[in-house]
């Protein structure tokens, strides 16, 4: 099972915990999974979800034809590529939908791996104390659909994920908190967010501006700094 090492436990331990604590690894979501086309893989379902009649009409209007869903590899779960990409992110964006129909996008950040892959079709992350607005939490109480954007700016890579989310009270499930949160952060975890992935799609790199963290910049310029230090040492010896 992907993510077992990151979770610090075996797949059996995860399954037993969730079963005993009434936290199923899979659930049908508030709006159900039965509406999904069983003939399509996760990647195909992503396009099917968004290729609505209005979208197809817009494609026809501006490009002279509507797009078809291209053939997809036969895989209906997150693969090792997605697993590694997800668990190396230190941030992601999550969109929810409010009761009045307005979308809300929230930035989530943490150490690389804070978004856990707990099964081939499920993600989880700890929800810490914040500004108390409870926007995403409230939105999910009325509509469990979520859309995630995971960005790798240096490599200009983007993974998009759709799923159904549920929120569990951390106080009622300390064992789950211990599996997905850093030990020093257990006391500030208020909720655990579980996401059942229904589809995903990789984006092209066009228009993604490369951005780098301070650590990545330091790593890149380290050889230059070493060379500068060598040259300065040579100058001092010659003076």
Over which residues does each language-model region extend?
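Charged/polar low-complexity intrinsically disordered segments
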Residues: 4-5, 12-13, 28
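Binding-site signature for planar aromatic cofactors or substrates
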Residues: 25-27, 33-239
């Amino acid at each position: 099972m992907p993510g077992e090492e990151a979770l610090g436990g075996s797949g059996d331990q995860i399954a037993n915990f969730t079963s005993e604590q009434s936290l199923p690894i899979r659930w049908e979501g508030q709006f159900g999974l039965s509406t999904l086309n069983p003939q399509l893989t996760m990647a195909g379902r992503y396009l099917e979800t968004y290729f609505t009649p209005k979208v197809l009409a817009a494609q026809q209007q501006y490009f002279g034809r509507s797009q078809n869903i291209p053939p997809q590899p036969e895989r209906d779960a997150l693969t090792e590529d997605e697993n590694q990409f997800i668990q190396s992110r230190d941030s992601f964006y999550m969109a929810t939908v409010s009761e009045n129909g307005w979308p809300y996008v929230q930035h989530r950040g943490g150490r690389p791996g804070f978004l856990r892959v707990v099964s081939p079709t499920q993600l989880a992350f700890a929800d810490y104390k914040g500004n108390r607005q409870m926007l995403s939490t409230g939105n999910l109480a009325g509509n469990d659909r979520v859309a995630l954007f995971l960005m790798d700016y240096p490599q200009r890579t983007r993974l998009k994920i759709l799923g159904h989310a549920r929120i569990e009270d951390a106080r009622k499930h300390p064992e789950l908190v211990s599996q997905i949160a850093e030990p020093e952060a257990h006391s500030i975890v208020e909720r655990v967010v579980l996401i059942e992935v229904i589809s995903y799609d990789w984006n092209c790199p066009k228009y993604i501006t490369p951005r780098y963290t301070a650590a990545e910049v330091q790593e890149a310029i380290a050889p230059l700094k070493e060379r500068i230090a060598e040259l300065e040492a040579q100058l001092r010896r010659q003076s």
